[in-house]
Amino acid sequence: MEYNAKNIEYKWQQIWKKNGYSEPKDDYSLPKKYILSMFPYPSGRLHMGHVRNYSIGDALSRYYRNRGYNVLQPIGFDSFGMPAENAAIKHKIHPKIWTYDNIDYMTKELDALGFSFSKKRLFATSDPLYTRWEQEFFIRMYEKGLVYRKSAVVNWCENDQTVLANEQVEDGKCWRCGHEVIQKEMPGYYLKITDYANELLECLKDLEGKWPNQVLTMQENWIGKSYGLEFEFKFDSSSKILLDGMDGFKVFTTRPDTIYGVSYAAIAPEHIVVKKLLEKNILDDATSAKLKFILNQSPKQRQSIDKDGVSLGLNVIHPLTNELIPVWCANFVLAEYGGGAVMSVPAHDERDFEFASKFNLNIKQIIKSDTLPYCEKSGVYINSELINGLAYEEAREKIISKFEKEGWGNRVTNYKLRDWGISRQRYWGAPIPMIHCKKCGVVPENISNLPVKLPDDVVITGEGNPLDKHSEFKNCKCPKCGSQATRETDTMDTFFESSWYFARFASDEKTWEDVAFDKKSVDYWMSVDQYIGGIEHAILHLLYARFFQKALRDLGYLRDCEPFDSLLTQGMVLKDGSKMSKSKGNTVDPDDIINKFGADTARLFILFAAPPQKELEWNDSAVEGAFKFINRLYDRSDNAYKTEILPQINHSNLNKDEKYARLKVYEALKKSTDVFENSFAFNTLIAACMEALNGLNAQNNKDIWTEGYFIILNLLEPIIPHACHELSNELFGLKNFTKLSLKDEVFVKDSLNLAITVNGKRRSEIEVSAFESDDKILEIAKQEVSKWIEGKEILKEIYVPNKLVNLVIKG
C-alpha cells in the first residue's frame, strides 16, 4: 500500500468526526477514564509544546478506548488575559475578535493533528455562559466568607494606571511602557485560600506515588507550614513615647531555642511601626528616604537583592534578659509572614548573619561551634541560662513553656501561604460581580442578573482600565435597595477560570445552561484520572485548582477532595539546546511538519524522541526517520493477509526465526501495558515495535506476519492513529483495536545464548538448552574455553542464569 499522509489523515479525521469517535458515552455503568491535558491560551498558533502535551494525552485516550473504557478527553481555551489586550493595542483589533479568531484557527490545527477531543464539550473561558457560573461561585464564596475585600500594597504603573503582577516588573520598571513601578496601597478582593492551608498540605499525602515528588515538594514548601513561638517584644519607655504609647509588636520564631542569641529585631518595611514613624515625621531625612526607597521595591525585588535596611532608633526589651534590643527595618522581612517582624539571631541564622555583618551589629553565640553562622538544630547551648547543656527538642520546649507560663507568648502554627488576590485592573477578564452602594456598602449582584457581561464598545489603549471609564457599564442600581450605585470595574485573575474548568468539562454539556455541574455526570467522571501539563504550573495553577475543588465541595457543588488523581509533567521542547521561542528564532511550526510529513510523523517523533518527563531536543533528521518508519510499516502490509481474528499458530512447530519474531511481537505487547498505564515511556514501546517489525522481516511465515502486524498496529494506533486505522481497515476491519492477550508459550525459550568470561574477559559464547542443568552448563562452558583454562587452577565457577558463565582462575 502507498502512504499518502495528507489524504489518509483527512479521510480518517472526517470519519471520526462523523461517527462521534471522540465523544464520551452516556453509559455510566462503563469503566471510565478522564484524560485531560492542560488547555491552551489562544495565542494564535499551536507550538511544539502543545503538540507534545496533546500527543501524550491522545495516546492514552486511544489506548483506553481500545480497551473498552468510556473515555473523556475534552479541549477548551483559557481565553481571558493580558495578551489579548496587548494585541488590541498593537494590531488595533478588539480583544474579543482577536481571541475568537485565534480559537477558530487553533481548533483547526488541533483537528489536523488527529487529536480525539470531545468537541461537544469545547468552550472558552471568556464565553458568557462560563462567566455566569464563575460569578455565581464568587458570590457564594463571598457569602460563605471565603472572599473578602481589603487594601494591600501592589505594583502600580502610574503611566498605564494599572496593577502589575510581579512577573511584569522588570528591573523596577513596567514591562510594557518602561515607566518606573511604585508600590501603592489599593483595595482588592481576596480568596481565603489560607482557610484550607492545612487540608491542602495534608491531602498531598494522598497524591504520593501519583504526582511527581518534585511537584509535591514545591507545593509543600509554598504552603510552608511551620511551628514556633509567638510573643511580643515590649518597647522601652523612650520608644513608647516616640510611638504615642504603642506597647510593642509581635514576632514569630521557629527557633525559640536561640532566643538568648537575639541581638536585634527586624521588621518589614510595611510594618505599622514604620508607618507611624513616617507619619509623625520624626526620622532624619536620610532614614526617611531610605525607608521610602525600600518601600517602593516590590517584595520580589527585595528578595533578589542584597540585604539592606535602616536603624529606626527604637529599642525593645529582651523578655528573658531585660537587655535593650535595637529595632531595624530590613528588606528581607516579609510583611505577611509571622506578623512582619522577626527576632534576629545572627550567630545561628545565615540571613541575620549577613545583615549583622553588613551593619556591624552584635553577634552573640549561644551554640558551640567553630564557625558562624551555625544553623543546625543540634549542639551544646551556651550563654543561655535556662537551657545550657540541653538537647534541641528539650531546649525548645523549655523556652516555649516558660513563655506560656509567664503569659508572654504562645506556641503557634504558621503558614507561608498567603490569601489569593484576584482583582485586576483589566478589561479582558471576568467582571467581579460586586456593586458599590452609598447606602448598603459593597454588595454582590443578584444571581438572577448573571452573567455581568463585558461591554463590547471599548477602546483598548493600555492606559488605565477601560471599564472604569465606561459609564453604561459602571453605573447601575443597587440590587439590595434599588438606589443608584456603581459596578465593580476590576476583573478576575485568569487563574480563577483555570481553577475549575476540569469540573465543567466533566458535566454533561446538555445541562450547561441550567446548572454549573450536572451531579450525575460530574460524580461519574471526576476526579481527572490523568492530568498532563508543564512543571511550570506546579504551584499556582495546581494549588489554586486544588483549593477550588475543596471550596466547591464545601459549597455543595462537587463531591471529591482532589481534582487530579494522577499528574504527568512533560518536559519542554528544545531546539539548539534552548527552549523554542520567537525571540531566539528557533521555533518549528507544527503546520510545516504536518504539510511536509503528516500529523502521524509529528506525533511519532514527539513520543519517540524522549520520555515525556524529560526535555525533548528537536531533530530534523529524526523527524525524517519517523516518516520513513511509517512508510516502512506501509510497505510491509503486503506480507499480511486479511482477517478479523488472530491466526491460530502452533508455536512448537515453528523454527528459530519464527519463534524469535513472535517473541519480539509479544514482548512489545507485554511492554505496552506498563507504558500506557504507568511509565508513559512511549519511546521504549515504539522501539520495541520497530524491533518486532525487524523480527518479522527475518522470517517468511505468513501467519506470523499477519499475527505480528495485527498486534503492532494495535500498539501503534494510539501514537500514529491515521496510518494504523487505514492499514487495519484494509486488512483487519479495525477488529484488532481491542484488548489483546499474551500467549505464555511464546515466552518459553528453547535455547539460551550465554557469554563465557575468564577472569572477567569475554572469551566465547555457547548455545544451550533452556532446560539444561547448571552443572551441565558449567561443564559445556569449560570445554568451550579449555585453551584459556588448561592447566590452571579454577578458583570460582559463576553462572548468572540466562546471561553468562564466568570462570575465575589463578595466575
Curated annotation (Swiss-Prot):
A motif ('KMSKS' region) lies at residues 579-583. It holds the Pfam family tRNA-synt_1g. One of its GO terms (cellular component) is cytosol. The keyword Plastid does not apply. Its EC number is 6.1.1.4. A motif ('HIGH' region) lies at residues 40-50. Keywords: Aminoacyl-tRNA synthetase, ATP-binding, Cytoplasm, Ligase, Nucleotide-binding, Protein biosynthesis. This is Leucine--tRNA ligase. The gene is leuS.
